[in-house]
Amino acid sequence: MAGKARVHELAKELGVTSKEVLARLNEQGEFVKSASSTVEAPVARRLRESFGGGKAAEGAAKAPAKAAAKGDAKTAAKGDVKAPDKALDAALDNAIKAGGNGEAAAPPAQPGGTATTPAAQATPEAPARPGPAAARPSAPAPGQPKPPAPGQPPRPGATPGPRPGPAPKPAARTPRVGNNPFSSAQPVDRPIPRPVPRPGAPRPGAPRPGASPGNMPPRPGGVGGPGRPARPGAPRPGGGRPGGPGGRDGGGGNYRGGGVGASPGGGGGFRGRPGGGGGGRPGQRGGAAGAFGRPGGAPRRGRKSKRQKRQEYDSMQAPVVGGVRLPHGNGETIRLARGASLSDFAEKIDANPASLVQALFNLGEMVTATQSVGDETLELLGSEMNYNVQVVSPEDEDRELLESFDLTYGEDEGTEEDLQTRPPVVTVMGHVDHGKTRLLDTIRKANVREAEAGGITQHIGAYQVTVEHDGVERPITFIDTPGHEAFTAMRARGAKATDIAILVVAADDGVMPQTVEAINHAQAADVPIVVAVNKIDVEGADPQKIRGQLTEYGLVPEEFGGDTMFVDISAKQGTNIDQLLEAVLLTADAALDLRANPDMEAQGVAIEAHLDRGRGPVATVLIQRGTLRVGDSIVAGDAYGRVRRMVDEHGDDVEEALPSRPVQVIGFTSVPGAGDNLLVVDEDRIARQIADKRSARKRNALAARSRKRISLEDLDSALKETSQLNLILKGDNAGTVEALEEALMGIQIDDEVALRVIDRGVGGITETNVNLASASDAVIIGFNVRAEGKATELANREGVEIRYYSVIYQAIDEIEKALRGMLKPIYEENQLGRAEIRAIFRSSKVGIIAGCMITSGVVRRNAKARLLRDNVVVSENLTINSLRREKDDVTEVREGFECGMTLGYSDIKEGDVIESYELVQKERT
């Protein structure tokens, strides 16, 4: 039917009942209500195919099949080489008479191994077939005699006998008119012949069925030599190309119509290949026609581009790291910031971060793509891929960051004429309690020492004092550094920011560890040293001894022929203070060129910073070059802001600060770190961008430093329970917090306990700190600060411990004791006594009772015991559950007495020995 069809009409056409049609439609997934319902043309076509085309098609298919069978029989009987053409003509005539739209079933395979092609679609306008041409002999199969050449009589026995062909397979169905539901030309209720299986398999690469366009008639072949006869094997499905002179099979569509020289049969295959047209792999199917006239079969594989070939070659040459193929470098240098992640590394080398993660995992390192990775890991991974990974130092990274904003730090702008003389910056260094702050108090005529907790300096201070020298008032800037061992970083910062160092040594105490450390800091910064031998008024003072000790460290006095100035002073009595200041100025004038440009943008260093309740973040800044003014946009480390106010050491407001001038700057949005460089920029936007990038870099570096590396070999031990003490540090200024953190992280106890600082900050303890401590099970350490507002109440409710300290070494000692208390205890075995089993008694209530004689020591109830048999341990970790002496329960039995005991163990024999012991906990150090 051309369009839709009703179910009862289809049933009548197919010769079945409507119920059978409805059932078949339901099997195909088409749910139709009744026999009067209509179905679409594609559904009707599939239904006809499922029923085999109906009775009319069966009748139409039988006639050509019989004719083809008769033709095959005659061919086999007569052995005429023209028989295939006659059989083909008969099949075509029968198909046209049957009205099957030119379609006819393919004849079965001939017994002699000659296969015929299926009848193609014919049209009334098809041209007349030319006479059959002389057939060429087919190529012999392996193992068969070669057929005689044309024109020669066959030799006896040379003709191959009949050979059974392969099992018939269903042929690939060719598209017919009406298969396309979108086509306007639909057939009008014409029976469709049932496809007949054809032997053999299609030849790979042959034209697919229905590949020729529509119902075009076959083109006649050109005039040429004799056609090639069909070779043994399966027919080649579909139409071939038009036959040329002496050429191959011709014909368009599904009809292998031949021109002059076209072969009559459909034999396929290349010459000399056994099996003919079916000569592919066994069981290989031929390609089917595509939908709506599109050529079917597998798509053509296009030629690869140069880029694809290059990518394949690079992937083949890529190194395999840990079983993962990674990009291959050419030895180029990859610059990565400290604390970079694998994603940063992958972005530099254009690789997949997941492959780097897998490679490191196979190498024994477990990290994620966004996790900060240590420098050694990055360098190892880069060397495996032939990359030279260079981890940029924080100084270089900060310089590159400033250069991206067209800024520089550490250089004076302008010419020599722009440079002006500036005051010297002097740092007072030395061992704790040797009189550094008392010396500065004497110079400033102040009393800073009494304000410090414990009498030791825990802050770094900066002051400017005017001294008269040769009748001229000359300012000198002093920086006071702590002498306690915990403040190494502060002393290092003071040495870097100074011009001259005053080394204070107590005449009665001598050279101490922090004295040596101060010498090393000053020499590393290439700073001249003036030695002040203090406490010469104290009993037992020996200044000459101090000079001899310092000679060992390269500080040779001038009276010994050296170049180091020594001044004997008494800070408490004020003795020789003027001589010390004169020595400082002489050293500055003789050895240093102290000049700076005051007309440039200010640059300096934040010596100290703290959070003031009323003023906010306050930073003590030492201006090194340029002039800092109120209203300037500044950035120091990861803090930025605008100068709202400047205060000197006396508390007076200052409008501008010249080089070597220490001032307190108010206006930062956050507390800068101690030792951060201060820089004046043009806009607040630039300052904010620089601070944000520095903050991100600082977080990455901190994460990389705090991450504990766990290898696969150490995974088992890492998964075991490890005690960890989490701390939150809050202090009154940034330098103290930094020093406290470094001192705490330097505590070395054991691998079983670990110390982790999860947060640090400047200012009072807030509710946010308490919530973080509650979530992470941490202890809050407050150094010279207290809890704010409702933080104390929240801490009591959440069970968070807050410890307050004002002296740094007290905090260090208590944290160290807490870490030691977290160590797992060690138990030492203490032998009590031995008992020999003399008799065994059995009781229904208590079980087996061992009658023993105490041979040595004492045996106690509830003590641990082990059972020995012939001096071999039979059972370990037993407990003496009950102990009796005659009829009385006793707690212990001494040597030489008999007793009865139960061990909760039944495998005991006479002669066994019970060894009693106890475990004593031993304190770990």
From Swiss-Prot:
InterPro entries registered for this protein in UniProt: EF-G-like_DII, IF2_II, IF2_N, P-loop_NTPase, Small_GTP-bd, T_Tr_GTP-bd_dom, TF_IF2_bacterial-like, TIF_IF2
Region annotated G4, chain positions: 534-537
Region called G2, residue ranges: 455-459
Transmembrane segments: none
Region of interest called Disordered, as start-end residue ranges on this chain: 52-84, 98-326
Location of this chain's protein in the cell: Cytoplasm
Ranges where the record places region G1: 430-437
Entry's Gene Ontology cellular component terms: cytosol
Biased composition (Pro residues): 139-169, 193-207
Region span, G5: 570-572
GO MF term list: GTP binding; GTPase activity; translation initiation factor activity
Sequence ranges of Basic and acidic residues compositional bias: 69-84
Biased composition (Basic residues): 300-309
Origin superkingdom: Bacteria
Biased composition range(s): Low complexity: 57-68, 98-138
Pfam family, one: IF2_N
PROSITE patterns (UniProt xref): G_TR_2, IF2
Keywords: Cytoplasm, GTP-binding, Initiation factor, Nucleotide-binding, Protein biosynthesis
Family membership: Belongs to the TRAFAC class translation factor GTPase superfamily. Classic translation factor GTPase family. IF-2 subfamily.
Protein name: Translation initiation factor IF-2
Organism of origin: Mycolicibacterium paratuberculosis (strain ATCC BAA-968 / K-10)
Lineage, top ranks: Bacteria, Bacillati, Actinomycetota, Actinomycetes, Mycobacteriales
